[in-house]
């Protein structure tokens, strides 16, 4: 029976990976990772050059990604079957298997769906990782929250009206799953009066990183690894007498 270790890989730059994750990956005899059919897989690319020459790789290829709406019954059936099958395969493997997961495994990570299926069937360890959004707001060079700011994490797949409601009720916000949903996100930000303060970070901490004001972006689409940010402006200690400040 296998022992499953899921390692969070952080936002993309291998140097931002946890020391424990780095050590486990380099020592792994078996790894597993998610990928879209025909693609190398972002998680696999992050660990390029770190793996033992004899490592056995298990590529878990999604049966569907953006071909069907995420709320489609067919989408749910396909993904549920996919996770069921891979949970069974991982349990049946001998020895230790290191599962790679971008960001943090317990923060919107695909591994969560395996985790719930593996509990009680096999020994599991999860190694935390820096989230992708953390890397992105550091790329802007600005703190994301101050004082009592309320931070909302939204999905670009939500309806425009839902996005507007949440955007108007928080101080700082992060929008994930942008990609082809960017036009909807942009309209929602404009309706909420927050477009002027929004940033688009593409490929945060990775090669090809690009940071731009969303209002200045002409394209209707963006890469999968892109996040929209609006920074909070909350309570902070201010210098009472600026003229004598050091």
Predicted regions, residues:
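Residues at the C-termini of beta-strands that transition into short coil/loop
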Residues: 35, 61-63, 128-130, 155-157, ...
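A contiguous loop/helix-start segment that scaffolds small-molecule binding in enzyme catalytic cores
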Residues: 4, 167-246
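Short gly/pro/ser/thr-enriched loop/turn and capping motifs at secondary-structure boundaries
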Residues: 38-40, 65-66, 131-134, 182-183, ...
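Class I S-adenosyl-L-methionine
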Residues: 1-14, 19-21, 26-121, 211-212, ...
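Class I SAM-dependent methyltransferase SAM-binding "motif I" and its flanking Rossmann-like core
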Residues: 103-169, 219, 232-236
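Conserved beta-strand scaffold positions in the cores of enzyme catalytic domains, especially
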Residues: 4, 57-59, 124-126, 153, ...
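Glycine-rich anion-binding loop/nest that anchors nucleotide
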Residues: 6-8, 35, 155, 174-178
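Short internal beta-strands
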Residues: 27-37, 126-128, 197-202
């Amino acid at each position: 029976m296998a022992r499953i270790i899921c390692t969070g890989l952080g936002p993309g730059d291998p140097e931002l990976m946890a020391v424990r994750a780095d050590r486990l990956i380099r020592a792994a005899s078996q790894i597993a990772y998610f990928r879209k059919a025909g693609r190398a897989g972002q998680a696999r690319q992050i660990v390029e050059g770190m793996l033992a020459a004899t490592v056995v790789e298990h590529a878990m290829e999604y049966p569907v990604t953006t071909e069907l709406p995420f709320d489609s019954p067919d989408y749910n059936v396909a993904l549920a079957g996919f996770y069921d099958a891979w949970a069974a395969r991982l349990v049946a493997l001998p020895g230790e298997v290191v599962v790679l997961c971008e960001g943090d495994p317990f923060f919107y990570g695909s591994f969560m769906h395996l985790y719930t299926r593996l509990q009680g069937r096999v020994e599991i360890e999860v190694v935390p990782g820096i989230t992708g959004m953390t890397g992105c707001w550091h790329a802007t060079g600005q703190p994301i929250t101050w004082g009592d700011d309320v931070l909302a994490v939204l999905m670009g797949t939500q309806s425009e009206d839902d996005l507007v409601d949440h955007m108007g009720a928080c101080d700082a916000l992060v929008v994930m799953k942008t990609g082809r949903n960017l036009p909807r996100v942009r309209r929602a930000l404009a309706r909420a009066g927050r477009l002027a303060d929004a940033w688009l970070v593409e490929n945060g901490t990775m090669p090809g990183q690009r940071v731009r004001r969303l209002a200045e972006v002409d394209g209707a689409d963006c890469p999968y690894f892109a996040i929209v940010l609006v920074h909070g402006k909350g309570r902070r200690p201010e210098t009472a007498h600026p003229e004598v400040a050091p």
